[in-house]
A protein has these predicted regions:
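Glycosyltransferase donor-sugar binding loop
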Residues: 41-43, 257-285
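Membrane-proximal helix-turn-helix segments that form the acceptor-binding/catalytic region
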Residues: 85, 136-180, 188
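Conserved donor-binding/catalytic core segment of Leloir-type glycosyltransferases
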Residues: 181, 217-236, 241-247, 258-261
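Nucleotide-activated donor-binding/catalytic signature segment of Leloir-type glycosyltransferases, i.e.
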Residues: 273-303
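Short alpha-helical donor nucleotide-sugar binding micro-motif in glycosyltransferases
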Residues: 302, 310-315
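Aromatic "clamp/platform" in nucleotide-sugar-dependent glycosyltransferases that forms part
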Residues: 323
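Short hydrophobic beta-strand element within catalytic cores of glycosyltransferases
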Residues: 340-344
Length: 380
C-alpha cells in the first residue's frame, strides 16, 4: 500500500491543527493510502479517541527521539527536515503538512515527483511581517503573543525566532505544493493577498465524537448559563468577558452562570487560569474550578467530553470572544449541538460559520456582546 506522510509540528495536545491533521490521516486511509504520522517530537496519539473520537493507534509514526515542551516554536523549524526524512524512509507518494516552515522541504519533494499538500491555518508571513500591522493580522497585535513574548527574556526568545524564520520560509506555497488548502473563505482572501493566488477552502471537520443534534433541548429546559469552549489562553479573551461582559449580565440577572471549558496542560495555560481566578476575586465575582459548580463562573479544566456535551446541551447561549478567529471549531461544535451563538464580527467564524450574521448574533464591544447574550438568554 502506498505511503502518505502527514506532517505536524506537535501531535500531543488537543487543538484545531491536531483535528485537521488526524482527520487528514483518516481521509488518506479511506483513499487507499497507508498514513505515516510525522513530527520533530515523539508522537502520542493515545488520547485522540477521548479528544475527537478518532483512533490513530494503527498508524506508523516518525519523529526525532525527543520529548520537549520547551522551545516549541524553534522545534517548528525542523518540521521540514522530518518530512523529508519520513518521505525518504517510507518511500511516500504524498506528503501533507500544515506548517509553513516545511515549505522548502515540500518544494524539494515536489521536484522529486512526490505530491505535496499544504494546509494553511493562517499565512505566516502576514502574522510576522509588520507591513500587516494596520490590518490586525500581525502577531505583535495578538494578545497571546504580547502576553507570552512581550517581556524579557521571552521577547528575546521571540526575536531570535523571527530572525531565523526567513531561512525556512520565503517560498510561495503555490510553488511548493501541488495543492494548497485553507480553513475558511476569510483566511483564503488573506492567502490570496499575501501570495497572489487563492487556495481551495476546506473547512475543518466536526470531530466524530461531537454528535449533531437534530432536535436540541427546548429553551424552557435550559439553565441560565453561557458556555465558552477553548484552551485556556489569552487569545480566547476569557479575561475580557469576565471584565467587560459578565458584570452587565449579572446586573441584569444574578442567576446567570458562565462556564469556561478548555484544556490546561501547560505552565502558560495554568498561569492564565490563575489570572482568571484572581481577576474574578478582585471583582467580587464567585468562581470555582469544581465540576459541581454553583458559582457565577465555572472553570472546567480538561473536562471529559461527556461533561462538555452535558453542559453545552443545558446552556442557553454559546459565546466566542476570539478576534479574527481563522475558523472556530468550538463555534462549529456549538452549532452542531443547537446552541444559539454570539460571535465577534471578525474572521472565518463570522464569515463562514455565522455567514455574516445569518446563523449567529455578532458584536464588536462589550456592551454589544452583553446585549446579544441577554437577547438569547431571554429568548427575544
Amino acid at each position: 500500500m502506498a505511503k502518505a506522510v502527514v506532517l505536524h509540528h506537535y501531535w500531543n495536545e488537543p487543538g484545531g491543527g491536531e483535528l485537521v491533521c488526524s482527520s487528514t490521516a483518516i481521509a488518506l486511509k479511506a483513499m487507499g493510502f497507508d498514513p505515516v504520522l510525522a513530527s520533530p517530537m515523539k508522537i502520542d496519539v493515545s488520547k485522540y479517541p477521548q479528544w475527537y473520537g478518532i483512533s490513530l493507534e494503527d498508524f506508523e509514526t516518525y519523529s526525532y527521539p525527543i520529548d520537549l515542551k520547551a522551545f516549541g516554536i524553534y522545534l517548528r523549524l525542523f518540521v521540514g527536515n522530518v518530512g523529508k526524512r519520513a518521505a525518504e524512509k517510507f518511500n511516500a507518494e504524498i506528503v501533507f503538512s500544515d506548517e509553513a516552515t516545511s515549505r522548502r522541504a515540500l518544494k524539494e519533494l515536489r521536484e522529486r515527483g512526490i505530491e505535496t499538500i499544504e494546509y494553511i491555518h493562517f499565512p505566516l508571513e502576514a502574522a510576522v511581517n509588520e507591513d500587516y500591522r494596520k490590518k490586525g493580522y500581525f502577531y505583535g497585535n495578538d494578545p497571546y503573543i504580547l502576553e507570552r513574548y512581550g517581556r524579557f527574556p521571552m521577547n528575546l526568545y521571540w526575536w531570535v525566532y523571527k530572525k531565523i524564520l526567513p531561512q525556512f520560509t520565503g517560498i510561495n506555497p503555490f510553488d511548493a505544493s501541488n495543492l494548497v488548502l485553507t480553513n475558511s473563505s476569510w483566511t483564503g482572501n488573506i492567502v490570496r493577498e499575501v501570495y497572489g493566488e487563492k487556495p481551495t477552502v476546506l473547512n475543518p471537520p466536526i470531530p466524530p465524537s461531537m454528535e449533531i443534534v437534530e432536535r436540541p433541548r427546548d429553551f424552557e429546559e435550559r439553565e441560565k448559563s453561557v458556555v465558552m469552549i477553548g484552551r485556556y489562553s489569552e487569545e480566547k479573551r476569557y479575561h475580557w468577558v469576565i471584565e467587560e461582559v459578565l458584570p452587565r449580565l449579572l446586573r441584569e440577572d444574578p442567576e446567570i452562570r458562565l462556564y469556561i471549558i478548555g484544556s490546561s496542560s501547560t505552565p502558560h495555560s495554568r498561569a492564565y487560569v490563575s489570572r482568571l481566578m484572581k481577576l474574578a476575586g478582585s471583582m467580587g465575582i464567585k468562581i470555582s474550578e469544581k465540576e459541581e459548580c454553583s458559582e457565577s463562573i465555572c472553570l472546567l479544566l480538561n473536562a471529559p467530553s461527556e461533561l462538555k456535551l452535558k453542559i453545552m446541551d443545558r446552556s442557553r447561549v454559546f459565546m466566542h470572544a476570539t478576534v479574527n478567529e481563522h475558523w472556530g471549531i468550538a463555534v462549529a461544535e456549538a452549532m452542531a449541538r443547537g446552541i444559539p451563538a454570539v460571535i465577534h464580527r471578525s474572521g472565518g467564524a463570522w464569515s463562514d460559520l455565522a455567514e455574516d450574521g445569518r446563523n449567529a448574533l455578532g458584536y464588536v464591544d462589550g456592551d454589544e456582546a452583553a446585549d446579544a447574550v441577554l437577547r438569547l438568554m431571554n429568548n427575544e
